[in-house]
Amino acid sequence: MPEGDTVARQCRILDEALAGTVLTTCELRVPREATADLVGWRVAEVRPRGKHLLMRLVPPVAGPPPLTLHSHLMMDGIWHVDGRALRSSDTSSGPRPADTIRVDLTARHEDGRQARAVAYDVKQVRLLRTADEDELVGHLGPDLLDPAWDEDPALRERAAANLAAEPERPIGLAMLDQHVLSGIGNIYRSELCFLRRVHPAAPVAEAGDPAELVDLAHRLLVLNRDREVRVTTGGMLGRDGDLWVYGRGGKQCRRCRSRIQRGELAEPRLEGTESRVLWFCPRCQAGPGCPPSAPTARGRRR
């Protein structure tokens, strides 16, 4: 699943291509919004909120309220801009079948240039009033890539407080909960735990200062939001040296040469959470085990 840095880069590319343009065609290929007519509407901006994409639109005439076209990349979603796919560590940039198109937009710049944006395999496509965006994203915790992060210490403080609120909860589950803080996915979950020398199954109370973890997560997402290939090692380890533990089960730890282990962690007490695979070093991250857990039913928004 694309993580917060990938979504932020996707939004930046869409914003650069579409902000200020007027829609000349618009197809929303989802039943709920299939009859929406947005021709003539102007794209004001495209902004991320955690892992959600918010395309804000201004009506062509006075009267109707501004609207937001919301989408979520989920596991396989991607936007193509003028036929070019986003390249990232999270997504395949190869061709996509036409029957997976969910949004197809063409737009005109003031100078007459045309732009096209096509969304493949995106989920949760919905059109709503911009004033009502919180109906879809209000449940999210502080966004690690919020533009106001450096100027507003309350964002960092709230994220740290959210993490600390359930001291017995495994840190590897708390970090992945978008209600706690938004932007971290499975890759960053594994990498952050390794960098903090914390076992993913360790309780929050034993995982060190939550504020320090939040700071590290913020720095890593900022570092990678403009990169096609995500790097958490500093990029000094050569080929196949971008990550410390994620996806490296059975390979040597880059620090101690122990074998990286693959485990699973689930939270049955929360409806809709599923067992998610993670990776860790048993020596650098000594702690409780991560036994396999059966998936539970879907339900909670991510």
Enumerate the language-model features and the residues they cover.
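Basic, nucleic-acid-binding surfaces and adjacent catalytic neighborhoods in DNA/RNA-processing proteins
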Residues: 23-37, 47, 158-302
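Short amphipathic alpha-helical signal-transduction/dimerization elements
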Residues: 15, 145, 149, 218-221, ...
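Generic detection of long, well-ordered alpha-helical segments
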Residues: 1-4, 149, 207-214
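Gly/Gly-Pro- and Ser/Thr-rich, intrinsically disordered tail segments characteristic of DNA damage-repair
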Residues: 1-126, 252, 300-302
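Phosphate/anion-contacting hairpin/loop surfaces
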Residues: 63-183, 188-197, 207
